[in-house]
Amino acid sequence: MASNAALQGEDIPQPQESPPDTACMEAQKWIEQVTGKSFGDRDFRTGLENGILLCELLNAIKPGLVKKINRLPTPIAGLDNITLFLRGCKELGLKESQLFDPGDLQDTANRTTGRTSDCNRKLRNVLVTVYWLGKAANGCSSFSGTNLDLKEFEGLLAQIRKENEEIESPKRSIRDSGYIDCWDSERSDSLSPPRHGRDDSFDSLDSFGSRSQQTPSPDVVLRGSSDGRGSDSESDLPHRRIPDVRKDDMSARRVSFGENKAFVPFNQYLPNKNNQTAYIPAPLRKKKAEREDYRKSWSTATSPLGGERPFRSMSMCDMRYEEEGSMLPHSRAHHEHLQHVNSLLKEEDDTWQDDLARWKTRRRSASQDLIKKEEERKKMERLMSGDSELSDRRKSIKTYREIVEEKERREKELHVAYKNAKTRGEAERILKSYIEKFTISEAVLEGLVMPKILERSQSVEPSLLSSSEDPNPLKYLRQQSLPSPKYTSTVEATVTPSSPCESKSPTGLISPSKNIISKTVPMLTAKPYSQPKNTQEVLKTFKVDGKVNLNGVEEQKGKESGSQTFAAPSLTRSQMFEGVARVDAPVVETKQDVASIKLNLARPNTLNSLHESNSLCEDRNHISQKDEPDSFVQEESVHSVEQLSEGNTQSNSTTQAVPAVSSIEIPPLTVNGKDTEDKRKVEAAELIMHWSLDSNYKEAKKNSLPPLKSSENVEESSKIKENESSHKVQLNITLQTRNAWRRSQFFLQSVDTECTEKSPALVPNLSSPNRSCTWDPEEERKRQEKWQQEQERLLQERYQKEQEKLKEEWEKAQKEVEEEERKYYEEERKIIEDTVVPLTLSPNSNVHFNISERNGNFIPVLPDHAKRDQENNNGQLMAEPNRVIKNEIHMHSNVTQQQILYAHERSMLAAEETQIKGKTEKWEAEPCNHVQSNECNTPTRLTLQAGCKQVMLSESCDLGSPKTPVDENAVHHNMSSIISTRGIDSKEETLNSSQSTSQCQSPNRSVSGKKLCSTCGLPLGKGAAMIIETLSLYFHIQCFKCGLCKGQLGDATTGTDVRIRNGLLNCNDCYVKSRTAGHPTPL
């Protein structure tokens, strides 16, 4: 804005007069009076240059408006103070157009561009601000100083108005499109405050012609340097921010358009109908008749729409008041009228701006709400329509149920794919690909069924299985996933065939006359990383043709052994890895029964469920080893299973081969667990049990007939001797390895070291057929018994430590209880000694004692010998109830016969209660401390408490009912005789009574900081408990049950409604039933 002002200053040079001295002097005088400080020898501008006086002036008008004044003698400090002053003026209500610029007070004497007119203009701006500030101070309630004389500023205002009128004169209207474009381009939005320009107004000069015909409006002239850049320019216009009514024509145009009012236009010197002497554009010079004829021509020349515009709009400048013609343009009435109109316009403009701001805020918030609702609606539509992106993202966030279902589905697909594999390589690839993607568990491995194609290939094409490959693709993978066992196991099995008739009975004798053909039997390793469980005593049994469930239940397919063609015995996955196997081994294309092998492992004698069956097998194996000196051990590789398949089809072999399982030791795992993958593979390979055949059997195999041509059924069974007299009893027993201890603590490190030392690693040589190693069950049993004794010793020590710890805690709790009870009894004793007056009784049975009455008379009490029988029946009575009676009689001297009878009945009841307590005290003296903690909850005490309640009820009923007169002497004699029978000190009896009573009254008192269960009476302990503090009820979680249906109330996961009715816990159902039955609920 400074640039355009400069341009105008160059194009329109105006002589600048100095501001009136009266206004300057009045402003200086007023500032000195208000602030109390003098300008001194400085002039007006120099005195205000540092801004200190201005800030103090503001604080004097409204205290605290300027909080901090910078008093440093630097130009920057002066600018800071002036900025604070202008900000405070805004808070007082002054507008931006009424304030001077911070640079107006700067010293420009040393500048080459400085002119006298420029300095005068800046000084006038400061005086105008002081004028408006004084006007605001006059109306400020917090200001009590001298008021500014506004009349002194009339000369200044008249001078500014005159100069403004000269600039607004039509003679100075410049039709220079270049100047207008230059002014508009320099009017930057970022540097000037936001306001409506002329082009946005209703009466824009575009109505009269194109943009090039615009004239700078007075609004532009008056606000020439409002953007803060015009202060230092050399030729800025002198008419900015004057207190005149014509400086805000924008508001007048906007409001007048909205309300259809014919206001006096602010720009009264612009061309209009009534002002024909002013400059009028060429089209308006036409006559009225000519305008109708040539409307299209000038409309085409001035409007971009050409002839399409049938009419032209009338500017607000063309509308005037009717009486405006009678007013002189420069009259005082006209001036006052304009001021009034301007004030109305200001108020309406402020209201309009507020309404606009509120509307924008409402519109913005409503728009944001609509946008949010629209986004939510679209999101729901995408969800309902199944958008792929959202559905995929939603699928990526799965619940636990979905994860479990997906895992089960994957495992099921693995089972089906593995079972339907056509080749060994395909099955292996299926399993490997699954293990690479997912984690496979033991249950999944156990549930896998060997592909049928592989089972048939082992029986139909045995030559294909004679390679050195592992017949089971799971073996290598299983070995990688399992840790190495840490023990050595040696097993020997003797295999003999049986006759057809004998094989039909499971326990029939096997004929030894058949040629013996050895058959490989897989030796299965244990899984030492599982914990032993007594519930795992049941041995798992697996079949080749059966499906094995996860719980060990076997689904067997019924197979007839007489007329079917059976597959050769093959090793399923479960047989290879689980350690417990059962193999039915029929021979191809025969009608013989299925031969089976039973392999018995001697188990330790610790599990009772396995002890009986294992001991018999151990004895038989031991006898068999003694009677078979020619048995040998020869290790065989894994692919000997295929060699066995070929050997099963051969017939009439004269060589008897008794294969045995060699002793294999698997080295334990390293402690650090940092073995490389190659080492782990080597260790996994050592897990495989190698079986070997006799070399004689191999020679016979070479000379034997081709496979699939033998019709003889080769049956395998364990050769067992029943007794020491060499009587051999052959049993057809199924192959079954009992390996229940594979998860036991037998594989602890201490036992591992011992086993490793006793059983060094054996590396059998296939070329030495005579190499044999016997398995001594006695040595094995001794070693296991020793281990068992060690475990029992450790368990016993642990048990002893736990018992000692519990005993110490129990003793500590008892001590705390005794200390607490001692303190409680001590307090009770002190209270009784302080409140109760002891009675001194005579040992004589005929005691005469007097009860003093308030009137000073004495009532003699005579003994009645007829009441002695009743005394004996009542037993010993404590002194406490009688003292209560004495005190009552002493306090109520004028008692009637009714009250005496009530006292007599109460003493009788107290005697009965004391008798019960005397019996209970003997029971309480027992040495069991834990019984003492529960003595108040015994049936006797509970009955006593209930009886006391009934007595109180009966007493209250007796008070209101009339009684027959009773002999007063008899009553007093009864009382005295009862008291005399107690030849014990009353203090002692009182103490005992208070002790027993206090114990009965507080059954739920804290035991070493722990509450007693309200149901069972035992301490709550450290377990879960339900506590109701407000009712002093405490329950174990197992005791927290309904008193009617006995249902648990504390096991609900979603919360339980518990009602307490008649002292019993009620569940919600029982409570509703009792309410519907009509039982009242006590408060």
UniProtKB/Swiss-Prot annotation:
Ranges for domain LIM zinc-binding come to: 1011-1077
- Give the residue ranges for region: Disordered: 1-22, 185-248, 291-311, 462-512, 625-661, 698-725, 759-779, 987-1006
Which residue ranges have biased composition labelled Polar residues? 478-512, 640-657, 991-1006
Q: Which residues form a coiled coil?
A: 356-424, 784-835
Q: What residue spans carry the Low complexity bias annotation?
A: 462-474
Q: Name one GO cellular component term.
A: stress fiber
Q: Give the GO biological process terms.
A: actomyosin structure organization; negative regulation of cell migration; positive regulation of protein phosphorylation; positive regulation of stress fiber assembly; regulation of focal adhesion assembly
Alphabetized, the UniProt keywords read: Coiled coil, Cytoplasm, Cytoskeleton, LIM domain, Metal-binding, Zinc
> Which compartments is it annotated to reside in?
Cytoplasm, Cytoskeleton, Stress fiber
- SMART domains (alphabetical): CH, LIM
What's its job?
Actin stress fibers-associated protein that activates non-muscle myosin IIa. Through the activation of non-muscle myosin IIa, positively regulates actin stress fibers assembly and stabilizes focal adhesions. It therefore negatively regulates cell spreading and cell migration.
What is the name listed in the Swiss-Prot or TrEMBL entry for this protein?
A: LIM and calponin homology domains-containing protein 1
